[in-house]
Amino acid sequence: MDVSELEENLFAASDAKLHGDMCKELSAVYCKVLSIFPSLEEARPRSKSGIQTLCSLHIALEKAKNILQHCSECSKLYLAITGDAVLLKFEKAKSALIDSLRRVEDIVPSSIGSQILDIVGELEHTKFLLDPSEKEVGDRIIALLQQGKKFDNGSDSTELEIFHQAATRLSITSSRSALAERRALKKVIDRARVEEDKRKESIVAYLLHLMRKYSKLFRSEMMDENDSPCSTPCSPTGQGPNEDRVNAFGRQLSKFGSINYKPMNSRKSGQMPIPPEELRCPISLQLMYDPVIIASGQTYERVCIEKWFSDGHNSCPKTQQQLPHLSLTPNYCVKGLIASWCEQNGITVPTGPPESLDLNYWRLAMSDSESPNSKSVDSVGLCTPKDIRVVPLEESSTIESERQQKEKNNAPDEVDSEINVLEGYQDILAIVDKEEDLAKKCKVVENVRILLKDNEEARILMGANGFVEAFLQFLESAVHDNNAAAQETGAMALFNLAVNNNRNKELMLTSGVIPLLEKMISCSQSQGPATALYLNLSCLEKAKPVIGSSQAVSFFVNLLLQDTKTQCKLDALHALYNLSTYSPNIPTLLSSNIIKSLQVLASTGNHLWIEKSLAVLLNLASSREGKEEMITTQGMISTLATVLDTGDTVEQEQAVSCLVILCTGSESCIQMVLQEGVIPSLVSISVNGSPRGRDKSQKLLMLFREQRHRDQPSPNKEEAPRKTVSAPMAIPAPVSAPESEVKPLTKSISRRKTMTRPFSFLWKKSHSIHH
C-alpha cells in the first residue's frame, strides 16, 4: 500500500468523535494489515480455500473500517449512549481479524507469515476499554432520556443543566458544533427509518429534540459574534444598544420551544388546560392518538394525514413542502410525551383517532390547492405553519375573547404580543403587510430577524409562507421613504432569511431584490446592509451572473479603496471573490479596475486584506485577460514578492501560486519576478511552507532554471553556474543578459540585503542539488 494512503487512513482514525483510544488501537492494526495485503494477494494459492481465506480477511478489514468510520461520522450523543454496543463491535472486529489472519498465516510464505504473527500477537494483547469520562457522560444522557418525559416547566432548568453539562463534556459548545451534531443525529434517524428500527428512531428523535431545544443557549454562551456572515446567520453589523433586547427575546423564544406540561396560568380556574402545540395534530387540532412522522419531519395523527394523502395531496400540510415519498413512521417519542402530559394534567389519554376533521382540514386543503410553493399575504390565514397557535375548536371562542380583552388592557404592547411565536406567522405577516405605522412594522421585522438568526427551520417555514415577498415589500417602502434604519432592518432580515437557504435566495432574485439593492448602495447610510445582503446572495450560483452584470461590481471595487467601515469593505471583498469564481464575470470585473484596487489592498501589509485579495487575484489570473493585466499593472509583481517575504504561510502559498500562473509562458514576467530578488523566499517556502506552497515554489524555481538554460549559450553551459556561486542572488539571472538588465537586480539585492545572509545557506544547498 502507498504510504500516503496509510497516512490518510491513520488520519481518518484519529478523527474519531468519541472512543478515540480504541479507534487509535484498531486503526494502527488496520493499517498494518493493509500494508501487507498486496503481498498476501500475490502469495495466495490458486485453491478455492485460499481465495476464501483472503475474502474472510477482507471482510474482517471491512468490519474494522466500518466501526472506525462509525466513530468518526456518527453523532457524539449517540456514540455516548451506545458505548457498550460500540465496545462490543470493537471486540468482534478484533476477533474477526485474529481468526482471519491465523487462517491466512497457514497459506502464505514464512516471510509474510512472521509479519502476520506479529500483528496477531499485537491484537491479542490489545484490550479495548471505554473511556471512564465518556461512559459517565453516556450514563447521564441515558438517565436524562429515561426521565425526559417526567420533566415539567418547574424542573426544566434541571434538564437544561444536565444536558448542558453532557454536551460540554462532548465539546458541543459552539454554534458550529451544535449544527454538526444536529445533522449527525438526523442521519442516524434516517438510518433507523431505513432499518425500520422504531426504538432507535424514537430515542434519537428525543436527542434531536434536546439539541434543538438548547442549541440557542450554547450559541449565546460560546459563539463568536464576529463569525463570517456566510457561515453563520449573524448580522455583519453590530447591534449595540439592542443587545439586551436581543438576548431577552432569545430567552423568550427558547421558552416557546419548550413543551409546557403544566396547566396554563392564563386559563381561568375550572377550565381545561390547553395541550402544547407539539402534542396536537395540525390537521385535527386535537391531542394525537397515533402520531406519525412524514417525510418533511412533521408529526400528524395517522388517520388525518392518511386522508390528506388519499385526497391526492403530496405536500406537507404545515410547511407546504413537496414530499419525496408518502411513507409514515410512528412517533413513539411524541406518544410518550402525550401520555406524560395527560397524566400530569389529569386528562384522559386519547383512546382513538378523532371522529371528525372539522373545518381545519378543509382550510389546509384550500391553502394547499392555492399555491404549491408560497402564499400571498392575503391567503396566509388559510394555513397553519409550524408556530401558529392551534387549539381545539371548542376552545377557540374562549381564546379569542381573551385575546381581545388583552388588546384592550395592554394596547402599548400590541406589537410585542404579535411577535410572540405562539400567535402565529400569519399575524406577523399581517402586521408587515397592513400596518401603517412604519415604527411598529420595523420592530416586528427586527424581532423576526433575531428569530431567523439561529433558527434554520424558521427560515424554511417562513420562506415557504410568504415572508420573502413581505420583507421585500417592507424594504421597498423603506427605500421609498429614504428611511436608513428601516432599510437596515429589512435588509438584515432578508440576510438572515437567506443564510444557508438557496430557495429563499432564488425567491429574492425573482421577486426583484437587485433593483432595491442598487437604490440602497446609492445612499452612504445604507451601503453596509446592502453589501451584506449582496454578499449572501453572491453565494448562490444563479445569482452570480445577475450581480456580475449589475452596478454592484463597480460599487464593490470602489468600496475597497474608500474610507468606510471595515466590515462593509470585507463584505465587498468577499462578494467580489464569489463573483470571480464565475468566469463570465471576469471581463466585467477587469473593466472596473479591480486589479489595481486589489494590488493596493494587498500592499498594505494588513493581513486582514492580503489573503482574500490574493484569492480574488488567483481567480482573475485564470483568464488570459486577467493574467496580462496583472503582469502589466505597476507594482503588482513587487507586491507579490513582498508577500513572499513577509506573509504568513497561507499568504505565501497564494502569492507563489499567482506567480506560477503569471510566469508560465511569459519570459518577460519571469524577468520581472527575478529582478525582485525572490529566490531566498522561494527556497525558504520550498522547505518550510505548506504542502501546496512547497509544490508551487518548486515549480516556480523550475521555471526560472528552464528560462536560464534557454538564455545561456550552449558552450558556456557548464561554466556559468560556477562563476556565480559566490553571488547567490544573481544565480537565477540570465548569464548572457546585458549589463543594463542586471542593474535592477543589484538594486533589488540591496533592498533585501538583510535577507541574503540568513537564506544563503539554503540557496547554496539548493544550488548544489539543482546544478
UniProtKB/Swiss-Prot annotation:
Residues 394-415, 706-751 are annotated as: Disordered. Its EC number is 2.3.2.27. Gene3D superfamilies: Leucine-rich Repeat Variant (1.25.10.10), Zinc/RING finger domain, C3HC4 (zinc finger) (3.30.40.10). It catalyses: S-ubiquitinyl-[E2 ubiquitin-conjugating enzyme]-L-cysteine + [acceptor protein]-L-lysine = [E2 ubiquitin-conjugating enzyme]-L-cysteine + N(6)-ubiquitinyl-[acceptor protein]-L-lysine. InterPro entries: ARM-like (IPR011989), ARM-rpt_dom (IPR006911), ARM-type_fold (IPR016024), Armadillo (IPR000225), RING-Ubox_PUB (IPR045210), Ubox_domain (IPR003613), Znf_RING/FYVE/PHD (IPR013083). Keywords: Repeat, Transferase, Ubl conjugation pathway. Residues 400-411, 706-722 have a biased composition (Basic and acidic residues). GO terms for molecular function: ubiquitin-protein transferase activity. One of its GO terms (biological process) is protein ubiquitination. Pathway: Protein modification; protein ubiquitination. Pfam families: Arm_2 (PF04826), U-box (PF04564). Residues 274-348 form the U-box domain. It comes from the Eukaryota. ARM repeats lie at residues 456-499, 502-542, 544-581, 583-622, 625-664. One of its GO terms (cellular component) is chloroplast. The keyword Chaperone does not apply. Functions as an E3 ubiquitin ligase. This is U-box domain-containing protein 6. It comes from Arabidopsis thaliana.
